Amino acid sequence: MPIQVLPPQLANQIAAGEVVERPASVVKELVENSLDAGATRVDIDIERGGAKLIRIRDNGCGIKKEELALALARHATSKIASLDDLEAIISLGFRGEALASISSVSRLTLTSRTAEQAEAWQAYAEGRDMDVTVKPAAHPVGTTLEVLDLFYNTPARRKFMRTEKTEFNHIDEIIRRIALARFDVTFNLSHNGKLVRQYRAVAKDGQKERRLGAICGTPFLEQALAIEWQHGDLTLRGWVADPNHTTTALTEIQYCYVNGRMMRDRLINHAIRQACEDKLGADQQPAFVLYLEIDPHQVDVNVHPAKHEVRFHQSRLVHDFIYQGVLSVLQQQTETTLPLEEIAPAPRHVPENRIAAGRNHFAVPAEPTAAREPATPRYSGGASGGNGGRQSAGGWPHAQPGYQKQQGEVYRALLQTPTTSPAPEPVAPALDGHSQSFGRVLTIVGGDCALLEHAGTIQLLSLPVAERWLRQAQLTPGQSPVCAQPLLIPLRLKVSADEKDALQQAQSLLGELGIEFQSDAQHVTIRAVPLPLRQQNLQILIPELIGYLAQQTTFATVNIAQWIARNVQSEHPQWSMAQAISLLADVERLCPQLVKAPPGGLLQPVDLHSAMNALKHE
Protein backbone atom coordinates (compact mmCIF):
# COMPACT_ATOMS: atom_id res chain seq x y z
CA MET A 1 0.00 0.00 0.00
CA PRO A 2 1.50 3.36 -0.97
CA ILE A 3 1.97 6.20 1.49
CA GLN A 4 -1.03 8.52 1.41
CA VAL A 5 -2.63 11.27 3.45
CA LEU A 6 -5.41 9.98 5.67
CA PRO A 7 -8.92 11.36 5.13
CA PRO A 8 -9.88 13.99 7.74
CA GLN A 9 -12.57 11.81 9.32
CA LEU A 10 -10.24 8.82 9.73
CA ALA A 11 -7.49 11.03 11.15
CA ASN A 12 -9.94 12.49 13.64
CA GLN A 13 -11.17 9.02 14.60
CA ILE A 14 -7.59 7.96 15.31
CA ALA A 15 -7.14 11.03 17.51
CA ALA A 16 -10.44 10.23 19.20
CA GLY A 17 -8.93 6.93 20.34
CA GLU A 18 -6.75 8.91 22.74
CA VAL A 19 -9.09 11.76 23.63
CA VAL A 20 -12.53 10.09 23.63
CA GLU A 21 -12.24 6.97 25.75
CA ARG A 22 -15.86 6.87 26.96
CA PRO A 23 -18.81 9.29 27.45
CA ALA A 24 -17.15 10.74 30.56
CA SER A 25 -14.20 11.82 28.39
CA VAL A 26 -16.58 13.78 26.16
CA VAL A 27 -18.17 15.46 29.17
CA LYS A 28 -14.76 16.41 30.57
CA GLU A 29 -13.56 18.02 27.33
CA LEU A 30 -16.78 19.94 26.70
CA VAL A 31 -17.21 21.19 30.28
CA GLU A 32 -13.59 22.37 30.32
CA ASN A 33 -14.29 24.31 27.11
CA SER A 34 -17.25 25.96 28.87
CA LEU A 35 -15.05 26.96 31.81
CA ASP A 36 -12.40 28.38 29.47
CA ALA A 37 -15.19 30.46 27.89
CA GLY A 38 -15.88 32.11 31.25
CA ALA A 39 -19.13 30.30 32.04
CA THR A 40 -20.63 30.71 35.52
CA ARG A 41 -23.33 28.08 34.95
CA VAL A 42 -23.01 24.75 33.15
CA ASP A 43 -25.93 22.36 32.58
CA ILE A 44 -25.11 18.77 31.66
CA ASP A 45 -27.92 16.59 30.27
CA ILE A 46 -27.22 12.88 29.82
CA GLU A 47 -29.36 10.13 28.31
CA ARG A 48 -28.63 6.41 28.58
CA GLY A 49 -25.31 6.95 30.26
CA GLY A 50 -24.12 9.25 27.47
CA ALA A 51 -24.49 6.69 24.69
CA LYS A 52 -27.64 8.36 23.35
CA LEU A 53 -27.16 12.04 24.24
CA ILE A 54 -24.66 14.36 25.88
CA ARG A 55 -25.76 17.99 25.99
CA ILE A 56 -23.58 20.69 27.54
CA ARG A 57 -25.12 24.16 27.88
CA ASP A 58 -23.25 27.18 29.27
CA ASN A 59 -23.55 30.96 29.59
CA GLY A 60 -20.00 31.71 28.47
CA CYS A 61 -18.80 34.24 25.94
CA GLY A 62 -19.92 32.17 22.95
CA ILE A 63 -18.30 31.65 19.53
CA LYS A 64 -18.51 34.08 16.63
CA LYS A 65 -20.24 32.93 13.45
CA GLU A 66 -17.07 33.12 11.36
CA GLU A 67 -15.21 30.93 13.89
CA LEU A 68 -17.78 28.12 14.16
CA ALA A 69 -16.33 26.16 11.24
CA LEU A 70 -12.84 26.47 12.71
CA ALA A 71 -14.11 25.25 16.08
CA LEU A 72 -14.81 21.84 14.51
CA ALA A 73 -11.52 21.70 12.63
CA ARG A 74 -8.41 19.87 13.85
CA HIS A 75 -5.69 21.83 15.63
CA ALA A 76 -7.76 25.01 15.74
CA THR A 77 -7.84 26.75 19.11
CA SER A 78 -8.10 30.17 20.71
CA LYS A 79 -6.03 29.15 23.74
CA ILE A 80 -2.46 29.35 22.39
CA ALA A 81 -0.72 30.96 19.44
CA SER A 82 3.01 30.46 20.05
CA LEU A 83 5.56 28.27 21.80
CA ASP A 84 5.67 30.76 24.68
CA ASP A 85 1.95 30.21 25.22
CA LEU A 86 2.46 26.43 25.18
CA GLU A 87 5.15 26.70 27.85
CA ALA A 88 2.92 28.74 30.18
CA ILE A 89 -0.56 27.28 29.79
CA ILE A 90 -3.25 28.64 32.09
CA SER A 91 -6.33 27.36 30.23
CA LEU A 92 -7.76 23.87 30.60
CA GLY A 93 -7.76 23.12 26.88
CA PHE A 94 -5.14 24.01 24.27
CA ARG A 95 -4.73 21.17 21.76
CA GLY A 96 -7.66 22.00 19.50
CA GLU A 97 -8.46 18.30 19.00
CA ALA A 98 -11.48 17.67 21.22
CA LEU A 99 -14.37 18.93 19.07
CA ALA A 100 -12.94 17.51 15.86
CA SER A 101 -12.34 14.12 17.48
CA ILE A 102 -15.78 13.99 19.12
CA SER A 103 -17.58 15.03 15.93
CA SER A 104 -15.84 12.22 14.01
CA VAL A 105 -17.34 9.50 16.25
CA SER A 106 -20.78 11.02 16.90
CA ARG A 107 -23.43 13.34 15.53
CA LEU A 108 -22.28 16.64 17.03
CA THR A 109 -24.15 19.93 16.82
CA LEU A 110 -22.64 23.22 18.01
CA THR A 111 -24.94 26.18 18.68
CA SER A 112 -23.54 29.46 19.94
CA ARG A 113 -24.09 33.18 20.21
CA THR A 114 -21.91 36.04 21.39
CA ALA A 115 -23.15 39.18 23.12
CA GLU A 116 -22.37 41.24 20.00
CA GLN A 117 -24.46 39.06 17.68
CA ALA A 118 -28.18 39.59 17.18
CA GLU A 119 -28.80 35.90 16.46
CA ALA A 120 -27.21 32.55 17.16
CA TRP A 121 -25.66 30.16 14.66
CA GLN A 122 -25.47 26.38 14.53
CA ALA A 123 -22.70 24.27 13.03
CA TYR A 124 -22.25 20.55 12.38
CA ALA A 125 -19.76 18.44 10.42
CA GLU A 126 -20.64 15.48 8.22
CA GLY A 127 -19.25 13.33 5.44
CA ARG A 128 -15.88 11.79 4.75
CA ASP A 129 -14.19 15.18 4.51
CA MET A 130 -15.94 16.54 7.64
CA ASP A 131 -17.46 19.50 5.80
CA VAL A 132 -19.00 22.00 8.22
CA THR A 133 -22.49 23.42 7.66
CA VAL A 134 -23.54 26.65 9.42
CA LYS A 135 -27.12 27.87 9.71
CA PRO A 136 -29.11 30.36 11.87
CA ALA A 137 -30.58 29.21 15.18
CA ALA A 138 -32.28 30.51 18.33
CA HIS A 139 -30.06 30.55 21.40
CA PRO A 140 -29.14 32.90 24.27
CA VAL A 141 -25.62 34.19 24.79
CA GLY A 142 -23.45 31.16 25.38
CA THR A 143 -22.91 27.77 23.78
CA THR A 144 -24.73 24.44 23.58
CA LEU A 145 -23.07 21.26 22.35
CA GLU A 146 -25.14 18.16 21.59
CA VAL A 147 -23.41 14.83 21.07
CA LEU A 148 -25.79 12.17 19.74
CA ASP A 149 -25.15 8.45 19.26
CA LEU A 150 -21.58 8.31 20.49
CA PHE A 151 -19.43 5.74 18.59
CA TYR A 152 -22.29 5.06 16.15
CA ASN A 153 -19.78 4.73 13.28
CA THR A 154 -17.11 2.85 15.24
CA PRO A 155 -18.83 -0.38 16.40
CA ALA A 156 -15.63 -1.78 17.90
CA ARG A 157 -15.40 1.15 20.31
CA ARG A 158 -19.08 0.89 21.19
CA LYS A 159 -18.64 -2.74 22.27
CA PHE A 160 -16.24 -1.65 24.99
CA MET A 161 -18.79 0.65 26.61
CA ARG A 162 -20.10 -0.57 29.96
CA THR A 163 -23.62 -0.53 31.30
CA GLU A 164 -25.64 2.67 31.42
CA LYS A 165 -25.21 2.90 35.20
CA THR A 166 -21.44 2.42 35.05
CA GLU A 167 -20.94 5.02 32.33
CA PHE A 168 -23.07 7.56 34.17
CA ASN A 169 -21.12 6.93 37.38
CA HIS A 170 -17.95 7.89 35.50
CA ILE A 171 -19.66 11.07 34.28
CA ASP A 172 -20.82 11.82 37.82
CA GLU A 173 -17.26 11.44 39.09
CA ILE A 174 -15.94 13.82 36.42
CA ILE A 175 -18.47 16.49 37.42
CA ARG A 176 -17.54 15.99 41.09
CA ARG A 177 -13.88 16.59 40.27
CA ILE A 178 -14.60 19.67 38.17
CA ALA A 179 -17.02 21.08 40.77
CA LEU A 180 -14.29 20.80 43.41
CA ALA A 181 -11.97 22.81 41.17
CA ARG A 182 -14.41 25.63 40.41
CA PHE A 183 -16.40 26.71 43.44
CA ASP A 184 -17.54 29.84 41.57
CA VAL A 185 -19.49 27.93 38.92
CA THR A 186 -22.93 26.30 39.21
CA PHE A 187 -23.17 22.77 37.82
CA ASN A 188 -26.45 20.93 37.13
CA LEU A 189 -26.24 17.26 36.09
CA SER A 190 -29.34 15.46 34.76
CA HIS A 191 -29.76 11.86 33.65
CA ASN A 192 -32.70 10.67 31.57
CA GLY A 193 -34.59 13.89 32.30
CA LYS A 194 -34.04 13.77 36.08
CA LEU A 195 -31.85 16.25 37.98
CA VAL A 196 -29.25 14.13 39.80
CA ARG A 197 -26.65 16.64 41.01
CA GLN A 198 -26.82 20.37 41.66
CA TYR A 199 -23.73 22.16 42.87
CA ARG A 200 -24.49 25.83 43.45
CA ALA A 201 -21.75 28.42 43.11
CA VAL A 202 -20.27 29.74 46.35
CA ALA A 203 -18.44 33.04 46.59
CA LYS A 204 -17.04 33.17 50.11
CA ASP A 205 -14.29 30.93 51.47
CA GLY A 206 -16.44 29.92 54.42
CA GLN A 207 -19.07 28.53 52.06
CA LYS A 208 -16.60 26.32 50.22
CA GLU A 209 -16.94 23.70 52.93
CA ARG A 210 -20.62 23.58 52.08
CA ARG A 211 -19.84 22.34 48.58
CA LEU A 212 -17.00 20.18 49.91
CA GLY A 213 -19.46 18.38 52.19
CA ALA A 214 -21.98 17.99 49.37
CA ILE A 215 -19.39 16.42 47.07
CA CYS A 216 -17.10 14.47 49.41
CA GLY A 217 -19.66 13.68 52.11
CA THR A 218 -20.07 14.53 55.76
CA PRO A 219 -17.55 11.93 57.07
CA PHE A 220 -14.74 13.60 55.12
CA LEU A 221 -15.84 17.07 56.21
CA GLU A 222 -15.82 15.97 59.86
CA GLN A 223 -12.23 14.77 59.64
CA ALA A 224 -10.91 17.45 57.25
CA LEU A 225 -7.88 19.50 58.30
CA ALA A 226 -7.49 22.78 56.44
CA ILE A 227 -4.14 23.51 54.78
CA GLU A 228 -2.73 26.87 53.72
CA TRP A 229 0.98 26.60 52.92
CA GLN A 230 3.21 28.83 50.82
CA HIS A 231 6.85 29.08 49.83
CA GLY A 232 8.01 31.37 47.04
CA ASP A 233 5.88 30.78 43.95
CA LEU A 234 4.36 27.59 45.39
CA THR A 235 1.03 27.59 47.21
CA LEU A 236 -0.79 24.59 48.66
CA ARG A 237 -4.40 24.87 49.80
CA GLY A 238 -7.19 22.44 50.55
CA TRP A 239 -8.02 19.73 53.04
CA VAL A 240 -6.52 16.44 54.20
CA ALA A 241 -8.40 13.94 56.36
CA ASP A 242 -7.03 13.24 59.83
CA PRO A 243 -5.10 9.95 59.34
CA ASN A 244 -6.00 8.86 62.87
CA HIS A 245 -9.67 8.70 61.87
CA THR A 246 -9.45 7.78 58.19
CA THR A 247 -11.85 4.98 57.23
CA THR A 248 -11.89 2.77 54.16
CA ALA A 249 -14.69 4.82 52.61
CA LEU A 250 -12.67 8.03 52.90
CA THR A 251 -9.64 6.62 51.08
CA GLU A 252 -11.52 6.93 47.78
CA ILE A 253 -11.41 10.72 48.16
CA GLN A 254 -8.11 11.63 46.54
CA TYR A 255 -8.38 14.79 44.46
CA CYS A 256 -5.42 16.97 43.53
CA TYR A 257 -5.34 19.97 41.22
CA VAL A 258 -2.43 21.82 39.65
CA ASN A 259 -3.29 25.40 38.67
CA GLY A 260 -6.97 24.44 38.64
CA ARG A 261 -6.45 21.35 36.47
CA MET A 262 -7.41 17.96 37.94
CA MET A 263 -4.49 15.56 37.99
CA ARG A 264 -3.52 12.00 38.78
CA ASP A 265 0.10 12.58 39.70
CA ARG A 266 2.33 10.01 41.38
CA LEU A 267 4.69 12.63 42.78
CA ILE A 268 1.91 14.45 44.63
CA ASN A 269 0.38 11.22 45.92
CA HIS A 270 3.77 9.99 47.13
CA ALA A 271 4.47 13.22 49.02
CA ILE A 272 1.11 13.06 50.80
CA ARG A 273 1.49 9.36 51.55
CA GLN A 274 4.98 9.93 52.97
CA ALA A 275 3.69 12.69 55.26
CA CYS A 276 0.95 10.42 56.60
CA GLU A 277 2.83 7.11 56.70
CA ASP A 278 3.43 7.19 60.46
CA LYS A 279 -0.31 7.40 61.12
CA LEU A 280 -1.65 5.15 58.35
CA GLY A 281 -1.79 1.38 58.31
CA ALA A 282 -0.11 -0.70 55.65
CA ASP A 283 -3.40 -1.08 53.75
CA GLN A 284 -4.64 2.49 54.24
CA GLN A 285 -4.51 5.43 51.88
CA PRO A 286 -4.73 9.15 52.72
CA ALA A 287 -7.84 11.14 51.84
CA PHE A 288 -7.36 14.65 50.54
CA VAL A 289 -8.57 17.50 48.35
CA LEU A 290 -5.54 19.66 47.56
CA TYR A 291 -4.88 22.57 45.23
CA LEU A 292 -1.32 23.30 44.12
CA GLU A 293 -0.58 26.64 42.51
CA ILE A 294 2.73 26.96 40.71
CA ASP A 295 4.31 29.22 38.10
CA PRO A 296 2.98 27.90 34.74
CA HIS A 297 6.53 28.06 33.35
CA GLN A 298 7.60 25.47 35.96
CA VAL A 299 5.15 22.76 34.88
CA ASP A 300 4.66 20.95 31.55
CA VAL A 301 1.01 20.16 30.84
CA ASN A 302 1.64 18.92 27.29
CA VAL A 303 2.40 15.34 28.37
CA HIS A 304 -0.76 13.30 27.75
CA PRO A 305 -3.55 13.89 25.19
CA ALA A 306 -6.17 13.67 27.94
CA LYS A 307 -4.06 16.04 30.11
CA HIS A 308 -4.22 13.75 33.16
CA GLU A 309 -0.51 14.05 33.89
CA VAL A 310 2.01 16.85 34.24
CA ARG A 311 5.77 17.13 34.63
CA PHE A 312 7.37 19.49 37.10
CA HIS A 313 10.67 21.10 36.13
CA GLN A 314 11.73 21.02 39.81
CA SER A 315 10.00 17.84 40.89
CA ARG A 316 12.04 17.39 44.07
CA LEU A 317 11.22 20.91 45.24
CA VAL A 318 7.51 20.35 44.60
CA HIS A 319 7.59 16.97 46.36
CA ASP A 320 9.29 18.34 49.48
CA PHE A 321 7.04 21.40 49.54
CA ILE A 322 3.88 19.28 49.55
CA TYR A 323 5.39 16.89 52.09
CA GLN A 324 6.27 19.72 54.48
CA GLY A 325 2.87 21.38 54.07
CA VAL A 326 0.89 18.25 54.91
CA LEU A 327 3.29 17.16 57.64
CA SER A 328 3.11 20.54 59.39
CA VAL A 329 -0.67 20.31 59.74
CA LEU A 330 -0.48 16.74 61.04
CA GLN A 331 2.26 17.68 63.51
CA GLN A 332 0.20 20.58 64.75
CA GLN A 333 -2.51 18.02 65.52
CA THR A 334 -0.31 16.03 67.87
CA GLU A 335 1.95 18.68 69.40
CA THR A 336 1.13 20.03 72.84
CA THR A 337 2.85 22.63 74.96
CA LEU A 338 3.75 22.61 78.66
CA PRO A 339 0.92 24.43 80.51
CA LEU A 340 2.41 27.34 82.46
CA GLU A 341 0.06 29.21 84.75
CA GLU A 342 2.28 32.32 84.65
CA ILE A 343 1.49 32.88 81.00
CA ALA A 344 -1.87 34.42 80.17
CA PRO A 345 -3.76 32.32 77.63
CA ALA A 346 -3.40 33.59 74.09
CA PRO A 347 -6.54 34.74 72.28
CA ARG A 348 -8.36 31.75 70.88
CA HIS A 349 -8.48 31.38 67.13
CA VAL A 350 -11.35 29.23 65.91
CA PRO A 351 -10.79 28.43 62.22
CA GLU A 352 -13.59 27.88 59.72
CA ASN A 353 -12.66 24.23 59.47
CA ARG A 354 -11.86 22.37 62.70
CA ILE A 355 -8.16 21.89 63.25
CA ALA A 356 -8.58 18.69 65.25
CA ALA A 357 -11.25 16.82 63.38
CA GLY A 358 -13.45 14.86 65.74
CA ARG A 359 -12.28 16.70 68.86
CA ASN A 360 -15.17 17.27 71.26
CA HIS A 361 -16.30 20.86 70.88
CA PHE A 362 -19.78 20.01 72.10
CA ALA A 363 -20.50 18.98 75.71
CA VAL A 364 -17.55 18.37 78.04
CA PRO A 365 -17.49 17.48 81.75
CA ALA A 366 -17.09 20.35 84.19
CA GLU A 367 -13.42 21.26 84.56
CA PRO A 368 -11.33 24.41 85.04
CA THR A 369 -11.56 26.88 82.18
CA ALA A 370 -7.81 26.76 81.58
CA ALA A 371 -8.00 23.02 81.01
CA ARG A 372 -10.55 23.52 78.26
CA GLU A 373 -8.36 25.95 76.35
CA PRO A 374 -6.62 24.16 73.47
CA ALA A 375 -2.86 24.15 73.66
CA THR A 376 -1.26 26.68 71.37
CA PRO A 377 0.56 24.84 68.56
CA ARG A 378 4.34 24.99 68.68
CA TYR A 379 6.39 26.16 65.78
CA SER A 380 8.22 23.27 64.13
CA GLY A 381 11.29 24.47 62.33
CA GLY A 382 11.59 21.24 60.36
CA ALA A 383 8.20 21.80 58.74
CA SER A 384 8.57 25.44 57.89
CA GLY A 385 9.31 25.02 54.23
CA GLY A 386 11.90 27.82 54.52
CA ASN A 387 11.49 31.38 55.63
CA GLY A 388 8.72 31.82 53.14
CA GLY A 389 6.61 29.08 54.72
CA ARG A 390 3.43 30.08 56.45
CA GLN A 391 0.41 28.29 57.82
CA SER A 392 -3.05 29.55 58.62
CA ALA A 393 -4.35 26.43 60.30
CA GLY A 394 -3.78 28.01 63.70
CA GLY A 395 -2.18 31.03 65.40
CA TRP A 396 1.56 30.76 66.03
CA PRO A 397 2.66 31.56 69.57
CA HIS A 398 5.45 33.88 68.49
CA ALA A 399 2.89 36.00 66.64
CA GLN A 400 1.32 37.11 69.93
CA PRO A 401 2.34 40.51 71.41
CA GLY A 402 4.90 40.25 74.19
CA TYR A 403 5.65 36.63 73.48
CA GLN A 404 9.44 36.98 73.67
CA LYS A 405 9.20 38.84 77.01
CA GLN A 406 6.93 36.15 78.45
CA GLN A 407 9.29 33.40 77.32
CA GLY A 408 12.22 35.17 79.03
CA GLU A 409 10.34 35.42 82.31
CA VAL A 410 9.37 31.76 82.16
CA TYR A 411 12.94 30.75 81.38
CA ARG A 412 14.31 32.70 84.38
CA ALA A 413 11.63 31.20 86.61
CA LEU A 414 12.65 27.70 85.56
CA LEU A 415 16.32 28.42 86.43
CA GLN A 416 15.56 29.56 89.99
CA THR A 417 16.10 27.07 92.84
CA PRO A 418 12.70 26.22 94.26
CA THR A 419 12.15 27.04 97.95
CA THR A 420 11.02 24.42 100.42
CA SER A 421 7.29 24.03 100.19
CA PRO A 422 4.73 21.40 101.06
CA ALA A 423 4.38 18.63 98.54
CA PRO A 424 1.62 19.38 96.06
CA GLU A 425 -1.55 17.42 96.26
CA PRO A 426 -1.77 14.63 93.72
CA VAL A 427 -3.72 15.61 90.65
CA ALA A 428 -5.90 13.10 88.92
CA PRO A 429 -4.45 12.22 85.51
CA ALA A 430 -6.26 13.65 82.51
CA LEU A 431 -8.66 11.32 80.83
CA ASP A 432 -7.47 10.14 77.45
CA GLY A 433 -8.36 7.49 74.95
CA HIS A 434 -5.88 4.99 76.40
CA SER A 435 -6.62 5.24 80.11
CA GLN A 436 -10.38 4.81 79.78
CA SER A 437 -11.80 2.42 77.22
CA PHE A 438 -14.68 0.04 76.72
CA GLY A 439 -12.17 -2.59 75.68
CA ARG A 440 -11.48 -4.59 72.57
CA VAL A 441 -14.23 -5.46 70.09
CA LEU A 442 -14.26 -9.22 69.56
CA THR A 443 -17.20 -9.61 67.19
CA ILE A 444 -20.66 -8.33 66.26
CA VAL A 445 -23.61 -10.21 67.73
CA GLY A 446 -27.09 -9.99 66.24
CA GLY A 447 -26.11 -7.21 63.87
CA ASP A 448 -26.38 -4.43 66.47
CA CYS A 449 -24.39 -5.53 69.54
CA ALA A 450 -20.64 -5.63 70.07
CA LEU A 451 -18.99 -8.32 72.17
CA LEU A 452 -16.20 -6.65 74.16
CA GLU A 453 -13.25 -7.92 76.17
CA HIS A 454 -11.86 -5.66 78.87
CA ALA A 455 -9.64 -6.51 81.84
CA GLY A 456 -10.42 -10.20 81.59
CA THR A 457 -14.21 -9.71 81.45
CA ILE A 458 -16.64 -10.13 78.58
CA GLN A 459 -19.38 -7.55 78.02
CA LEU A 460 -22.13 -6.98 75.48
CA LEU A 461 -22.63 -3.39 74.27
CA SER A 462 -25.68 -2.07 72.42
CA LEU A 463 -24.40 -0.16 69.39
CA PRO A 464 -27.68 1.74 68.72
CA VAL A 465 -27.71 2.98 72.33
CA ALA A 466 -24.06 4.05 72.09
CA GLU A 467 -24.81 5.83 68.84
CA ARG A 468 -27.73 7.65 70.50
CA TRP A 469 -25.50 8.89 73.33
CA LEU A 470 -22.90 10.02 70.80
CA ARG A 471 -25.51 11.96 68.82
CA GLN A 472 -26.72 13.62 72.02
CA ALA A 473 -23.17 14.70 72.88
CA GLN A 474 -22.65 16.04 69.36
CA LEU A 475 -25.91 18.00 69.53
CA THR A 476 -25.46 19.45 73.02
CA PRO A 477 -23.81 22.89 72.86
CA GLY A 478 -20.82 23.51 75.08
CA GLN A 479 -19.15 26.89 75.50
CA SER A 480 -20.19 27.84 71.97
CA PRO A 481 -23.24 26.88 69.90
CA VAL A 482 -23.19 23.82 67.68
CA CYS A 483 -21.94 24.67 64.20
CA ALA A 484 -24.82 25.03 61.73
CA GLN A 485 -24.47 23.52 58.26
CA PRO A 486 -26.47 25.40 55.57
CA LEU A 487 -28.77 23.24 53.47
CA LEU A 488 -28.22 23.25 49.73
CA ILE A 489 -32.00 23.31 49.27
CA PRO A 490 -33.86 24.89 52.24
CA LEU A 491 -36.79 22.88 53.61
CA ARG A 492 -40.12 24.76 53.58
CA LEU A 493 -42.93 23.41 55.80
CA LYS A 494 -46.46 24.51 56.58
CA VAL A 495 -47.11 24.93 60.33
CA SER A 496 -50.09 25.65 62.54
CA ALA A 497 -50.40 28.66 64.84
CA ASP A 498 -49.42 26.61 67.93
CA GLU A 499 -46.41 25.15 66.17
CA LYS A 500 -45.32 28.60 64.99
CA ASP A 501 -45.56 29.99 68.54
CA ALA A 502 -43.52 27.08 69.89
CA LEU A 503 -40.84 27.62 67.25
CA GLN A 504 -40.59 31.32 68.06
CA GLN A 505 -40.21 30.57 71.78
CA ALA A 506 -37.53 27.95 71.13
CA GLN A 507 -35.76 29.79 68.29
CA SER A 508 -32.74 30.84 70.35
CA LEU A 509 -32.31 27.34 71.80
CA LEU A 510 -32.63 25.76 68.37
CA GLY A 511 -29.99 28.19 67.12
CA GLU A 512 -27.61 26.92 69.80
CA LEU A 513 -28.27 23.41 68.51
CA GLY A 514 -27.38 24.47 64.96
CA ILE A 515 -30.96 24.60 63.63
CA GLU A 516 -31.65 27.86 61.83
CA PHE A 517 -34.99 28.81 60.27
CA GLN A 518 -37.14 31.67 59.08
CA SER A 519 -40.91 31.88 59.48
CA ASP A 520 -43.68 33.78 57.73
CA ALA A 521 -47.47 33.70 57.99
CA GLN A 522 -48.09 29.95 57.69
CA HIS A 523 -44.73 28.47 56.75
CA VAL A 524 -41.30 27.91 58.24
CA THR A 525 -38.14 27.50 56.15
CA ILE A 526 -35.32 25.42 57.62
CA ARG A 527 -32.04 26.86 56.32
CA ALA A 528 -29.39 25.06 58.38
CA VAL A 529 -29.07 21.99 60.60
CA PRO A 530 -26.19 20.58 62.68
CA LEU A 531 -23.77 18.23 61.00
CA PRO A 532 -25.18 15.00 62.56
CA LEU A 533 -28.54 15.70 60.87
CA ARG A 534 -27.25 16.33 57.34
CA GLN A 535 -27.77 12.71 56.30
CA GLN A 536 -31.19 12.39 57.93
CA ASN A 537 -34.58 12.53 56.21
CA LEU A 538 -35.40 16.06 57.32
CA GLN A 539 -38.84 16.03 55.70
CA ILE A 540 -39.86 13.51 58.37
CA LEU A 541 -37.63 14.46 61.30
CA ILE A 542 -38.25 18.24 61.34
CA PRO A 543 -42.09 18.04 61.33
CA GLU A 544 -41.89 15.53 64.19
CA LEU A 545 -39.56 17.88 66.08
CA ILE A 546 -41.97 20.78 65.56
CA GLY A 547 -44.83 18.64 66.85
CA TYR A 548 -42.79 17.73 69.92
CA LEU A 549 -42.02 21.39 70.64
CA ALA A 550 -45.69 22.34 70.30
CA GLN A 551 -46.55 19.93 73.14
CA GLN A 552 -43.99 21.40 75.55
CA THR A 553 -44.57 24.23 78.01
CA THR A 554 -40.88 24.85 78.78
CA PHE A 555 -37.82 24.37 76.62
CA ALA A 556 -34.25 23.30 77.36
CA THR A 557 -31.43 22.51 74.97
CA VAL A 558 -30.63 19.27 76.79
CA ASN A 559 -34.19 17.99 76.38
CA ILE A 560 -34.35 18.98 72.71
CA ALA A 561 -30.97 17.38 72.00
CA GLN A 562 -32.06 14.22 73.81
CA TRP A 563 -35.30 14.05 71.79
CA ILE A 564 -33.44 14.48 68.50
CA ALA A 565 -30.87 11.84 69.45
CA ARG A 566 -33.66 9.36 70.20
CA ASN A 567 -35.51 10.02 66.94
CA VAL A 568 -32.75 10.16 64.34
CA GLN A 569 -32.39 7.13 62.12
CA SER A 570 -29.29 5.01 62.56
CA GLU A 571 -26.80 5.17 59.72
CA HIS A 572 -26.01 1.47 60.14
CA PRO A 573 -28.91 -1.03 60.06
CA GLN A 574 -26.30 -3.81 60.19
CA TRP A 575 -23.07 -2.97 62.00
CA SER A 576 -19.63 -4.13 60.91
CA MET A 577 -16.51 -4.49 63.04
CA ALA A 578 -14.94 -1.36 61.56
CA GLN A 579 -18.07 0.70 62.18
CA ALA A 580 -18.33 -0.53 65.77
CA ILE A 581 -14.67 0.27 66.51
CA SER A 582 -15.05 3.75 65.01
CA LEU A 583 -18.22 4.40 67.03
CA LEU A 584 -16.65 3.32 70.32
CA ALA A 585 -13.60 5.49 69.67
CA ASP A 586 -15.87 8.51 69.19
CA VAL A 587 -17.92 7.67 72.28
CA GLU A 588 -14.80 7.25 74.42
CA ARG A 589 -13.55 10.63 73.24
CA LEU A 590 -16.78 12.64 73.36
CA CYS A 591 -18.62 10.86 76.18
CA PRO A 592 -15.95 9.75 78.68
CA GLN A 593 -18.54 9.65 81.48
CA LEU A 594 -20.15 6.63 79.79
CA VAL A 595 -16.94 4.63 80.24
CA LYS A 596 -16.80 5.37 83.98
CA ALA A 597 -20.52 4.89 84.66
CA PRO A 598 -22.35 3.15 81.79
CA PRO A 599 -26.11 3.90 81.84
CA GLY A 600 -28.74 1.22 81.77
CA GLY A 601 -29.28 -0.43 78.42
CA LEU A 602 -25.78 0.31 77.14
CA LEU A 603 -23.54 -2.37 78.63
CA GLN A 604 -24.37 -5.85 79.93
CA PRO A 605 -21.75 -8.15 81.52
CA VAL A 606 -21.64 -11.72 80.24
CA ASP A 607 -21.35 -14.30 83.04
CA LEU A 608 -18.65 -16.65 81.84
CA HIS A 609 -18.15 -18.22 85.27
CA SER A 610 -21.58 -19.86 85.20
CA ALA A 611 -20.90 -21.25 81.76
CA MET A 612 -17.48 -22.52 82.80
CA ASN A 613 -18.88 -24.13 85.94
CA ALA A 614 -21.58 -25.82 83.88
CA LEU A 615 -18.93 -27.26 81.58
CA LYS A 616 -16.84 -28.48 84.51
CA HIS A 617 -19.78 -30.41 85.96
CA GLU A 618 -20.45 -32.27 82.72
UniProtKB/Swiss-Prot annotation:
Residues 367-403 are annotated as: Disordered. GO terms for cellular component: mismatch repair complex. InterPro entries: DNA_mismatch_repair_CS (IPR014762), DNA_mismatch_repair_MutL (IPR020667), DNA_mismatch_S5_2-like (IPR013507), HATPase_C_sf (IPR036890), MutL/Mlh/PMS (IPR002099), MutL/Mlh/Pms-like (IPR038973), MutL_C (IPR014790), MutL_C_dimsub (IPR042120). Residues 367-381 have a biased composition (Low complexity). PROSITE patterns: DNA_MISMATCH_REPAIR_1. GO terms for biological process: mismatch repair. GO terms for molecular function: ATP binding; ATP hydrolysis activity; ATP-dependent DNA damage sensor activity; mismatched DNA binding. SUPFAM superfamilies: ATPase domain of HSP90 chaperone/DNA topoisomerase II/histidine kinase (SSF55874), DNA mismatch repair protein MutL (SSF118116), Ribosomal protein S5 domain 2-like (SSF54211). Keywords: DNA damage, DNA repair. Residues 382-392 have a biased composition (Gly residues). CDD domains: HATPase_MutL-MLH-PMS-like (cd16926), MutL_Trans_MutL (cd03482). HAMAP family: DNA_mis_repair. Belongs to the DNA mismatch repair MutL/HexB family. This is DNA mismatch repair protein MutL. It comes from Salmonella newport (strain SL254).
